[in-house]
Amino acid sequence: MEALRQRIEAAFEARAEITPNSVEPSVRADVEKAISMLDKGEARVAEKIDGQWHVHQWLKKAVLLSFRIFDNGVIDGGETKYFDKVPMKFADYDEARFKEEAIRVVPPATVRKGSFIGKNTVLMPSYVNLGAYVDEGTMVDTWATVGSCAQIGKNVHLSGGVGIGGVLEPLQAGPTIIEDNCFIGARSEVVEGVIVEEGSVISMGVYLGQSTRIYDRETGEVHYGRVPAGSVVVSGTLPSKCGTYNLYAAIIVKKVDAKTRGKVGINELLRIVD
């Protein structure tokens, strides 16, 4: 894999000269290999190593190169047709393969090739972009969007209309990450590389970006870009420094461990007790 990484890095430096007609066959083959690895889950844009998330920038570069290398083509879509550079992940699947991978895909869910979908995953009418990683046992509910290179953990529930932001550029930006056993409430948005740590519950209509203040009401701490593990988060406001107005904030109203979360329903966790 190291040799492939080096070749992708070199091709990316020369990307300005690359077109679908001029690309070297070896470069095309390398990019296709990288996309295939992402598609199969053999590689991922980000992975947790020794408790820390590490981003493999060369895989993001491979995704960006694919847009320069591949030309638009007609894509069959049931009752209609599409015209794009990226084919659909399930275009060649048959009944046996869906059963083998234990994936449910409800029309008109759209999943682009180069994204990984784990076993026992349910995709309601939703969208998963290339480079994304959706782990086992996850539900992507109706009109939810998983952006490019986003990382979704095991047994996650992305409720209706949830937006998980994609990050391809700038290259130094990390992907948005939802760790294992999280619940993201309807119409919430998690973007700009925010990390929602394991076992957290995000209420309906919470918006999390790098500049969002995430206030822990029990400790008074303010977090940016990270929701600590086991947090229960709702929308709220915090006063301005001058005290004349309030600005949006996400409020951590309580912390729960896995044992408590397993015994108590999501709705019960979201009931705020003053």
From Swiss-Prot:
Keywords: Acyltransferase, Amino-acid biosynthesis, Cytoplasm, Diaminopimelate biosynthesis, Lysine biosynthesis, Repeat, Transferase. It comes from the Bacteria. The gene is dapD. The keyword Transferase applies. Pathway: Amino-acid biosynthesis; L-lysine biosynthesis via DAP pathway; LL-2,6-diaminopimelate from (S)-tetrahydrodipicolinate (succinylase route): step 1/3. GO terms for biological process: diaminopimelate biosynthetic process; lysine biosynthetic process via diaminopimelate. This is 2,3,4,5-tetrahydropyridine-2,6-dicarboxylate N-succinyltransferase. The keyword Repeat applies. Transmembrane segments: none annotated. Homotrimer. It holds the Pfam family THDPS_N_2. One of its GO terms (molecular function) is nucleotidyltransferase activity. Its EC number is 2.3.1.117. Its main location: cytoplasm. GO terms for cellular component: cytoplasm. It catalyses: (S)-2,3,4,5-tetrahydrodipicolinate + succinyl-CoA + H2O = (S)-2-succinylamino-6-oxoheptanedioate + CoA. It is an enzyme of class 2 (transferase). It is found in: Cytoplasm. Belongs to the transferase hexapeptide repeat family. The lineage of its organism: Bacteria, Pseudomonadati, Pseudomonadota, Gammaproteobacteria, Alteromonadales. InterPro entries: DapD_Trfase_Hexpep_rpt_fam, Hexapep, Hexapep_transf_CS, THP_succinylTrfase_dom1, THP_succinylTrfase_N_sf, Trimer_LpxA-like_sf. Substrate binds at residues 104, 141. Disulfide bonds: none annotated.
